[in-house]
A protein has these predicted regions:
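An alpha-beta-alpha
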Residues: 86-132, 239-259
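Short, well-structured alpha-helical segments in soluble
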Residues: 25-39, 143-161
């Protein structure tokens, strides 16, 4: 995403200052205050640390990408559509039980729609389903241990059933796939796996993973268009700020690979 945003210089000729915070809200607030001292014209926010209400108080054009954005403009993937596509494919492939693996996402976060769409689609088609939101951890190893625990539970709870596993991102999907290969030396016919994001790990996995692809280039372009419109308006003699935040959703693309029929 960052690469796509930075490449927009040739179109808009705006220079970028990039800050990455790792130590919470206080550090991020300090960074933003430093940025404001540089008299920046606008801000693109990808982190989830500060609420959109806090961000809106800075009184500069702001666009959020894939995060809570009640009080500021935003661009997101249509997470509901992506999860609907993934869930529908697993249903078409005649899985006996559908399982969604995720963290416990707050409802205000766009990615929550992946959970909502999975649940509503399973109910609509009257397909048995299981939602596991217990993934946690800050390191790769901690998360892998959680995925291993969930894999063991699924193996014990759903023997002799074809299992359709929809994971919230490609990293989780790759972990789950590797655990299957460690046990079975292959992807058995009673497992199907779908990830989300179309990150490089999905195509580079031991078996290329079916995934819901986010159109990162379009998301970045749309975010820049939204931000530039607001910044240009601010330069007018009598600027007219947005009456309310603008929220745009970009359609995802289901990319079928080797982990589904």
């Amino acid at each position: 995403m960052l690469t796509q945003l930075l490449s927009s210089y040739s179109d808009y000729h705006y220079k970028f200052l990039v800050f990455s915070s790792e130590h919470g809200a206080e550090e991020e607030q300090q960074y933003i205050e430093e940025l404001l001292s540089y008299q920046i014209e606008g801000l693109i926010v990808l982190s989830h640390t500060l609420s959109s209400k806090q961000l809106s108080s800075y009184q500069i054009p702001i666009v959020a990408i894939e995060r809570e954005a009640e009080y500021i403009s935003s661009v997101t993937t249509d997470n509901y559509m992506g999860a609907l596509q993934a869930t529908t494919l697993l249903i078409r492939d005649k899985c006996d039980i559908l399982i969604h693996i995720n963290v416990n996402v707050e409802k205000a976060v766009p990615a929550y729609d992946r959970i909502r769409a999975f649940k509503e689609t399973c109910k609509e088609y009257q397909v048995p389903y299981d939602i596991d939101l217990s993934v946690s951890g800050n390191s790769y190893q901690e998360i892998l241990n959680e995925i291993r625990r969930i894999f063991t539970r699924i193996e014990e709870k759903y023997p002799n059933q074809k299992k359709g596993i929809f994971l919230s991102n490609d990293t989780y999907a790759n972990m789950f796939l590797n655990l299957i290969f460690q046990k079975y030396r292959e992807l058995p016919s009673f497992y199907e796996i779908i990830g989300f994001d179309n990150s490089p790990i999905a195509s580079e996995a031991i078996l290329p993973i079916t995934t819901v692809g986010q159109q990162i280039d379009i998301i970045a372009q749309t975010a820049m268009e939204l931000l530039v419109q607001q910044m240009e308006e601010q330069k007018k003699r009598s600027p007219k700020p947005l009456e309310k935040p603008v929220h745009k959703q970009i359609a995802p693309v289901l990319i079928r690979r080797n982990t589904t029929s």
